[in-house]
Design a protein with these regions (language model features):
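Core segments of cupin and vicinal oxygen chelate
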Residues: 2, 9-53, 82, 88, ...
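Short loop segments at secondary-structure junctions
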Residues: 13-14, 43-45, 77, 110, ...
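Short acidic, gly/pro-rich beta-turn/loop elements at beta-sheet edges
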Residues: 18-20, 50, 65-67, 82-84, ...
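Vicinal oxygen chelate
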Residues: 3, 5-12, 32, 39-41, 53, 60-81, 85, ...
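Acidic pyrophosphate-coordinating catalytic loop
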Residues: 43-49, 62-65, 112
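A structural detector for beta-sheet-dominated domains
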Residues: 41-43, 58, 75
Length: 130
């Protein structure tokens, strides 16, 4: 394949704050904070295959006003523990019309960007992830 995703960019009002928040949520590290742009990367050694992109937070002047057209889906080992953890970090549950019968929960980060915490990994999936 000749292309790969280098990074995922998220528009925001305060790149430094949102990068730190997402780094805490994902267990990643902030590797750049240059005022209008901040970058988080996964821990060293977690992307030897080059598949995991950086996340870049870019300052924009306009506030978020509608539902995201792109969002992150996070797959935990223990969904209930992660729901409690992201809420303790400041994530807010949001209703985007998903209903109560879903295996995922929709949240918003401190600037209102939606993301989902999916069902927990099965033991087989955990073993595959090593």
């Amino acid at each position: 394949m000749s292309l790969r995703i280098q990074c995922v960019c998220i528009d925001c009002a305060d790149p430094a704050v949102l990068a730190r928040w997402w780094a805490d949520v994902l267990g990643w590290r902030v590797t750049a904070d240059e005022g209008d742009e901040a970058v988080i990367e996964p821990p060293a050694g977690s992307r030897e295959d080059g598949v995991v992109p950086d996340v870049v937070f870019l300052r924009v002047p306009e506030p978020k006003t509608v539902k995201n057209r792109l969002h992150l889906d996070l797959r935990p080992v223990d969904q209930q523990a992660e729901l409690a953890r992201v809420e303790a970090l400041g994530a807010k549950r949001v209703d985007i019309g998903q209903g109560d019968d879903k295996t995922w929960v929709v949240y918003a980060d401190p600037e209102g960007n939606e993301f989902c915490v999916l069902r927990a990994l099965t033991p087989e999936e955990v073993a595959e992830d090593g």
